[in-house]
Amino acid sequence: MCGNNMSAPMPAVVPAARKATAAVIFLHGLGDTGHGWAEAFAGIKSSHIKYICPHAPVMPVTLNMSMMMPSWFDIIGLSPDSQEDESGIKQAAETVKALIDQEVKNGIPSNRIILGGFSQGGALSLYTALTTQQKLAGVTALSCWLPLRASFSQGPINSANRDISVLQCHGDCDPLVPLMFGSLTVERLKGLVNPANVTFKVYEGMMHSSCQQEMMDVKYFIDKLLPPID
């Protein structure tokens, strides 16, 4: 990867305390790194699960006056009708699929992997889960939206994850990605995957961030879908 400006440092990893039989891949938000989320998962970890928090490559972001910062894809605007970086989103999804493949090579089947993320990372996790042929255990999407929503059919998706479990979380005081985005996204998701498996949790007073209750809800979701198998 030397000389490629898309390269990013190795992910922050919280290793399993014993043999890893499941994994969580969690994607941070715009301008962040995986380190803070790795610390958060270290606080709610289970001994058989490996938690992988990759770092986005650094690129110019149109929304922020083309300043260079860690970003999974370019963000042009934050309104519902903003133009989207279609090629960048699709390329980023391929990067995430490669991370999933790497864990499968390490001996963890894809249906023992949960994909998740916060804000831009959550958006990418939803898009990847809905477009990959890798069957996943679930998605945990925090304070985010569904990118390229017009590219999805009106009916259920015809892919491996039409019955996937989704935990979507949002703060009701989010000034950056308004709660309405989360509400619209969850309604769209219920048309794309089995609606019985979609859970939407709203946290009173929470802004564009996380909170202790949300992390406990994430832990419960992960531990329920990825129980120990030995």
From Swiss-Prot:
Alphabetic keyword roster: Acetylation, Cell membrane, Cytoplasm, Endoplasmic reticulum, Fatty acid metabolism, Hydrolase, Lipid metabolism, Membrane, Nucleus
GO molecular function: carboxylic ester hydrolase activity; lipase activity; lysophospholipase activity; palmitoyl-(protein) hydrolase activity; phospholipase activity
Pfam families on file: Abhydrolase_2
Summary of the tissues where the protein is detected: Ubiquitous. Detected at low levels in all tissues tested.
One GO CC annotation: nuclear membrane
InterPro entries in the cross-refs: AB_hydrolase_fold, LYPA1-2/EST-like, PLipase/COase/thioEstase
Keyword Lipid metabolism: yes
Catalytic residues of the enzyme: S119 (charge relay system), D174 (charge relay system), H208 (charge relay system)
Entry's localization field: Cytoplasm; Cell membrane; Nucleus membrane; Endoplasmic reticulum
UniProt-listed Enzyme Commission number(s): 3.1.2.-, 3.1.2.22
Biological processes annotated in GO: fatty acid metabolic process; fatty acid transport; negative regulation of aggrephagy; negative regulation of Golgi to plasma membrane protein transport; protein depalmitoylation
Broad EC category: hydrolase
Family under the similarity heading: Belongs to the AB hydrolase superfamily. AB hydrolase 2 family.
Protein known as: Acyl-protein thioesterase 1
